[in-house]
Regions:
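Exposed, low-structure sequence patches enriched in small/polar residues
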Residues: 1-163
Length: 163
C-alpha cells in the first residue's frame, strides 16, 4: 500500500481574468491551492492472481484577491473587484483490476473504473477544508465502467503437431 499526498500553494499569483467591454485585458491576483492525494496498492491472492487498485483525488481552488487592468507600459492599474469569480474544481478516479494468469501467456482481467461526472460540482465557498471537500466529492454522482479482457495464448507448434 502506498499513499502520496502533495499540496502546492501560490499567493498573489497573476492570472488572466477576462476583458473589459473595450477589450482591455483584466488580470486577477489570486491565491491558488492544488492538493492531490493518491492511494494505491496491490494484493496477491496467489502468485498468479492479484487485485490492484488506485484512488486519486485532485482539488484545485482559486480565490481572487483583487483585479487590475494593464496600461500601455504593462503596469497593473487597480480596478473594482469582480465578485463570484473564485473557482473550485475536483477530480476523482478509482481504478481496480482483478488479474488471473490462468495459463502461461493467458489471462483474464476484470476492471472497474469509478469517476466523478463532468457536471458535478462542490461549492468551494461552503466546503473550504480538504476533508470536507473530499466528503462532498464522494457524495456526488459518479460514473462507473466495467471491462473484461480475455487473452489466450495459442501455441501454433502444438496445433501443428496434432495434425
Amino acid at each position: 500500500m502506498e499513499l502520496n499526498h502533495r499540496r502546492e500553494m501560490e499567493t498573489d499569483y497573476i492570472v488572466f481574468a477576462g476583458r473589459e467591454i473595450n477589450q482591455e485585458p483584466i488580470i486577477g491576483f489570486v491565491n491558488f491551492t492544488d492538493i492531490t492525494s493518491i492511494y494505491s496498492g496491490i494484493y496477491n491472492f496467489t502468485p498468479r492472481m492479484n487485485l490492484t487498485m488506485r484512488i486519486r483525488h485532485n482539488w484545485s481552488k482559486v480565490i481572487y484577491k483583487s483585479f487590475a487592468n494593464v496600461d500601455a507600459n504593462g503596469n497593473d492599474v487597480p480596478r473594482a473587484f469582480i465578485p463570484n469569480r473564485d473557482e473550485n474544481v475536483n477530480f476523482f478516479n478509482l481504478d481496480a483490476f482483478f488479474t488471473w494468469d490462468f495459463r502461461l501467456g493467458s489471462r483474464i482481467v476484470f476492471g472497474w473504473k469509478n469517476f466523478l461526472g463532468n457536471e458535478e460540482f462542490v461549492d468551494g465557498s461552503v466546503h473550504r477544508k480538504y476533508l470536507n471537500n473530499l466528503g462532498q466529492t464522494l457524495d456526488l454522482r459518479h460514473g462507473n465502467e466495467l471491462t473484461l479482457r480475455f487473452i489466450y495464448f495459442i501455441d501454433y507448434n502444438s496445433l501443428k503437431k496434432k495434425r
